[in-house]
Swiss-Prot record:
Organism the protein comes from: Zea mays (Maize)
Lineage: Eukaryota, Viridiplantae, Streptophyta, Embryophyta, Tracheophyta
Recorded family membership: Belongs to the zein family.
Pfam families the record matches: Zein
Other comments on record: The alpha zeins of 19 kDa and 22 kDa account for 70% of the total zein fraction. They are encoded by a large multigene family.
The protein, known as: 22 kDa alpha-zein 8
MF-aspect GO terms: nutrient reservoir activity
Function: Zeins are major seed storage proteins.
Residues spanning the signal sequence: 1-21
Keywords for this protein: Seed storage protein, Signal, Storage protein
InterPro entries: Seed_Storage_Prolamin, Zein
Length: 266
């Protein structure tokens, strides 16, 4: 009886061990993909090659590290494209006006292009405009510095001390340039009073009120038939053209601004 009980217990033990046991093949040719079905992941990595483990770790690190910066770069590129599109649309709105300005006045067009890059223009528009107006008088001041350095230095000193220069620099510079004509007009008054009076005609109120009468008066003064001697008429016209030669040597810009005298010769 005892032997039967022991035999039953042995059979039960074998049955229980057979249901809970699993086989690990020592020399199996099965691929590594089948192993995780029977073993946990940590145990399955122990049976892989070291090169395979390093490759999997590298792929995992690359996926975790590079995924977030790629998304950020894509977002930055989209934002940059959006800003570039808005800037292009704004620039296209001003292209017709800038094209017309380029045709009419190329210098003003270039200044308009440099307006955004000038810190003075962004900080103080009034000071920038005053600076642009002062640059219009720089050629005349440069010529004055070459012809007469003492007068140029004196003018620079007066520019810093005069209240008119501080309040309205272009008007002050224009006034100073007009004062340069006074010595030539004085010499003309001594040499030829008639030509001197004719030189003052552009400042006459008759030119402002009635241009036709002013032109008729100029033609009467310049008509050589009214002078009895043609040589005297030619001499007077030559005397009238003399101040313009002096103006062209001293200041070419002012010589272009002066009225043309001696139209009968030309």
């Amino acid at each position: 009886m005892a032997t039967k009980i022991l035999a039953l217990l042995a059979l039960l033990a074998l049955f229980v061990s057979a249901t809970n046991a699993f086989i690990i093949p020592q020399c199996s040719l099965a691929p590594s993909a089948i192993i995780p079905q029977f073993l946990p992941p940590v145990t399955s990595m122990g049976f892989e090659h070291l090169a395979v483990q390093a490759y999997r770790l590298q792929q995992a690190l690359a996926a975790s590290v590079l995924q977030q910066p790629i998304n950020q770069l894509q977002q930055q590129s989209l934002a940059h494209l959006t800003i570039q599109t808005i800037a292009t649309q704004q620039q296209q709105q001003f292209l017709p006006a800038l094209s017309q300005l380029d045709v009419v006045n190329p210098v003003a067009y270039l200044q308009q292009q440099l307006l955004a890059s000038n810190p003075l223009a962004l900080a103080n528009v009034a000071a920038y405009q005053q600076q642009q107006q002062l640059q219009q008088f720089l050629p005349a001041l440069s010529q004055l510095a070459m012809v007469n350095p003492a007068a140029y230095l004196q003018q620079q000193q007066l520019l810093s001390s005069s209240p008119l220069a501080v309040g309205n620099a272009p008007t002050y510079l224009q006034q100073q340039l007009l004062q340069q004509i006074v010595p030539a007009l004085t010499q003309l008054a001594v040499a030829n009073p008639a030509a001197y009076l004719q030189q003052l005609l552009p400042f006459n109120q008759l030119t402002v009120s009635n241009s036709a009468a002013y032109l008729q008066q100029r033609q009467q003064l310049l008509n050589p038939l009214e002078v009895p001697n043609p040589l005297v008429a030619a001499f007077l016209q030559q005397q009238q053209l003399l101040p313009y030669s002096q103006f062209s040597l001293m200041n070419p810009a002012l010589s272009w601004q002066q009225p043309i005298v001696g139209g009968a010769i030309f």
